[in-house]
Amino acid sequence: FIPCSEGLLQFTDDGKFVRSVVKRGQGPGEYSIIRFIAANDRLKQIYIMDNGRILTYTIGGDYVGESKIPFCWQFTLLGDSAYVGYIYNNTGQKKDRLVLVDRQGETLNTFPQYDQFTIANGLNYYLWGYYDRYLYSFREEACCKEYYNDTVFTVTPERLEPRYILD
């Protein structure tokens, strides 16, 4: 699946176009902007983060439902019933780094942001690339690797567990 201005496009493993999976619009099951996507191969579902919500679809494009999520930079799945959202510390003063939210939009847990800094008034600090992934799923585990951190973490409902330290 590839998100683009035309929607969420599905391709075969060898690169052949299959279809446009979902529709942009303001109606039920439609998105206004694709901020980020995730997929669950086992459940055969895809998830689109769209300003304050996550829309769920089947691989075939059928609308399943919607969940509310606080504004996040990226997200990934945590098991079958929760999401992990990454809060980018662009002001230097964000209190939280990650937020865990269930499918009903209830906050389950947050993980603090320890990297606090001061920047000139009215400015934001961005150090990222368009294809950077701070959160991702690997073997059905949620993982987090920040741009300026040497540690890859596994995210559990209770804590961040160091998984790898990169030299």
Q: Over which residues does each language-model region extend?
A:
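Aromatic (tryptophan-biased) beta-strands that constitute blades/sheets of beta-rich domains
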Residues: 1, 18-21, 45-47, 65-66, ...
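Short beta-strand elements that form the blades of beta-propeller/WD-repeat-like
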Residues: 1-4, 9, 44-50, 81-92, ...
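Blade-loop segments of beta-propeller domains
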Residues: 7-11, 16-51
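Short loop/turn segments that connect beta-strands within beta-propeller blades
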Residues: 12-16, 58-62, 102-106, 155-159
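Surface-exposed loop and turn segments in beta-propeller and other repeat-based domains
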Residues: 19-31, 106-129, 162-167
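Short coil-to-beta transitions that initiate beta-strands within beta-rich domains
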Residues: 26-38, 70-72, 124-137
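Asp-box/WD-like beta-propeller blade repeats and closely related beta-sheet repeat scaffolds
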Residues: 31-35, 49-97, 107-123
